[in-house]
Each structure stands twice: as structure tokens, then as C-alpha cells.
Design a protein with these regions (language model features):
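Conserved alpha/beta-domain cores
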Residues: 1-196, 202-204, 216
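Divalent-metal-activated hydrolytic enzyme cores
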Residues: 207-208
Length: 221
């Protein structure tokens, strides 16, 4: 079933869009089934769960951290994380850099923007992000690589609102790229879109979609 679901989602994706299979709260067996069907990129949002899965699953899996990351947990994910999707403060970015330096590696990160009409979502406002980038301190952080932006649309049935939010992030991505990352080939990821809204996200320019329930079914809490 998982393999069929995966095949269906992948068949809908343009060449430039990659799938992050959101495996949080799902058992190793579910991930193994998706892995056997060819999926290599998986997303987790709990540090302890991600660490345990990393230890016991194939080492060529690319693990993405997609949850809200607390500064005191960074050291546990830095050794093996391929991409952190939710950097929502300079403090967090600096701490990732510090732990990455200790691990002697460079960690790929996305800056999370708050685009939804919901207080529960994390992220920089557009102005806060501009201020942080303009200040330039991030340029001194040699063990992180800012690879793009991430955002979550409002959880609503209003397709027009979702489209508007994704399009606003997409145009902000173009602004940030032009102003601060014009020569950075690595700044190319726009992570937006989940099981219920990834079609709208892709239409707005997403390069990474985060899909869980449409592949694995509902989660086991």
C-alpha cells in the first residue's frame, strides 16, 4: 500500500520537485517499505525518534528535520541531518553553526517564514528575515549553509488563501535570492506544501514537498 501511495505522489511531481516523505510517528517497517520502493528522503520532527531511526535504518537515507528545533537538542541531530527545514531565529542558526563546528561539518538549513494566518506556526516575518540577512552576521557562520526558505500555509479549505500565501513566499524567495544569495548556487530550495496542499505549492514554485499521511496513512500517536 505504501509503495503504491508513494508511486502515485511521485507521478504527480515535476522534475524539479523533490519529495520529503514525512515518517514521524510511523514505525521503521513503514519507512523500510517506502525505502524498498525507492524513497531516500525522509522527514522527522522529534529529535529522539529521528536519532533512533537513524541508528537502525539504512545509512543512505537522507534525513530532514522538519519540526520546531530547540537549541538544546541541536547537538543530537547535527551529526547526521541532511537539511534542517525550520530555522526561525538567528540564535538557532548560530547554535547549529556552533554544534556543526564541533562535529567538523557544514549543515544545510532553510529559513522558516511565517506566512499563515495562525499564531501556532513558527517562523520569521518577512521584515525580521530581511533585518537578519541585512545585518550580515550570518556570513561569519562557516559551518552552516543557507539553502533556501520554508513555510507552512494556513490549515484551511480556502484554496485562494493557500495560493496567496505560497505565492507571497515564492516572491520573497526571489527577493532574498537576488539581494543576498545571487551568487550562491546552493540557495535554491523552497520547501512548501504538505499532503493537503502540495499541488498549490508546486504551482507557486515549491522545490521540496513534505508529504506524510498521503503516503503512510494516518499517524500512530
Amino acid at each position: 500500500m505504501i509503495a503504491e501511495n508513494l508511486k502515485q505522489v511521485l507521478s504527480e511531481l515535476p522534475a524539479k520537485v523533490r519529495l520529503v516523505a514525512v515518517s514521524k510517528f510511523h514505525p521503521n517497517e513503514a519507512i523500510e517499505e517506502a525505502y524498498r520502493a525507492g524513497q531516500r528522503v525522509f522527514g522527522e520532527s522529534k529529535v529522539q525518534e529521528m536519532t533512533a531511526k537513524y541508528e537502525s535504518l539504512p545509512k543512505d537515507i537522507e534525513w530532514h528535520f522538519i519540526g520546531h528545533l530547540q537549541t538544546n537538542k541541536i547537538k543530537y541531530v547535527v551529526p547526521y541531518v541532511a537539511l534542517i527545514h525550520g530555522i526561525d531565529s538567528y540564535k538557532l542558526l548560530a547554535e547549529v553553526n556552533k554544534q556543526a563546528a564541533k562535529a567538523e561539518k557544514t549543515v544545510n538549513c532553510l529559513l522558516q517564514l511565517h506566512i499563515a494566518r495562525e499564531e501556532t506556526k513558527f517562523g520569521f516575518s518577512f521584515d525580521e528575515c530581511r533585518e537578519m540577512l541585512a545585518a550580515g552576521e550570518w556570513r561569519e557562520l562557516k559551518h552552516i549553509r543557507i539553502c533556501g526558505l520554508m513555510g507552512m500555509a494556513t490549515n484551511t479549505d480556502n484554496d485562494e488563501q493557500i495560493k496567496t500565501e505560497f505565492c507571497s513566499l515564492s516572491s520573497f524567495f526571489n527577493e532574498v535570492k537576488a539581494k543576498w544569495f545571487a551568487d550562491a548556487e546552493s540557495f535554491r530550495e523552497l520547501s512548501m506544501g504538505m499532503s493537503h496542499d502540495y499541488h498549490e505549492a508546486i504551482a507557486a514554485g515549491s522545490t521540496l514537498i513534505r508529504v506524510g499521511s498521503k503516503i503512510f496513512g494516518e499517524r500512530n500517536y
